[in-house]
Regions:
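Contiguous, amphipathic alpha-helical segments that mediate oligomerization or scaffolding
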Residues: 2-49
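Hydrophobic-cavity lipid-handling domains and compact docking modules
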Residues: 45-146
Length: 184
């Protein structure tokens, strides 16, 4: 692999990831309206879903007491040699397919952000990996749609993004706070 080839691949990966992130933000905005319209008469107005565009590389989706933060990393990554992705022939047969951009999905308590409780950590609930050919896979909590073994078998599109977001929302809603142990 030459410097020029590797640089071109990494730039293509960045461009693809950025395009997917823009599509993700559009999907989040549309989903917010659709869900709020569907639930308008059923839920308290204080727990409506709210979408916030936080700039080129971040978007937020508030769902009840949780905030899902979608964050596009501005760097391109390759997987370490121990990562399970190297068992996939799509990557093994063409090393350049292993370079991926990442969109991280975090879950925070909305009050942690609202009241600047910076000591309260969020949870990484998912990562979307996108390569030069718009092939993708997802690592994450209950993300079953496109696992590493399917990498190279599907181009990411709006339908896939909606599925990923729905899984992240469901995970956030099912994740209950646990009382920390009390030590005497």
């Amino acid at each position: 692999t030459t410097l020029v080839e590797k640089s071109n691949v990494q730039q293509k990966v960045f461009d693809n990831t950025f395009a997917v992130f823009e599509e993700l933000k559009e999907a989040l905005h549309e989903m917010t309206s659709e869900i709020n319209d569907a639930l308008e008469e059923q839920i308290d107005k204080r727990i409506r879903i709210e979408y916030r565009d936080r700039g080129k590389f971040e978007a937020q989706l508030q769902v009840a007491g949780d905030v899902l933060i979608f964050s596009m990393h501005t760097n391109v990554f390759e997987f370490n040699r121990e990562h399970i992705i190297w068992q996939n022939s799509y990557v093994r047969d063409e090393k350049l397919n292993s370079y991926c951009g990442i969109i991280n999905i975090y879950n925070f308590l909305s009050d942690s952000l609202k009241y600047n409780r910076n000591a309260e950590e969020g949870y990484l609930v998912g990562r979307i990996f996108i390569n030069r050919e718009m092939q993708y896979f997802v690592e994450g909590k209950r993300q079953m749609s496109m696992r590493h073994n399917n990498f190279g078998q599907g181009v990411i599109d709006k339908s896939a993004l909606i599925d990923i977001v729905e899984h992240a929302i469901n995970y956030a809603l099912e994740f209950d706070l646990l009382v920390p142990p009390y030590e005497i």
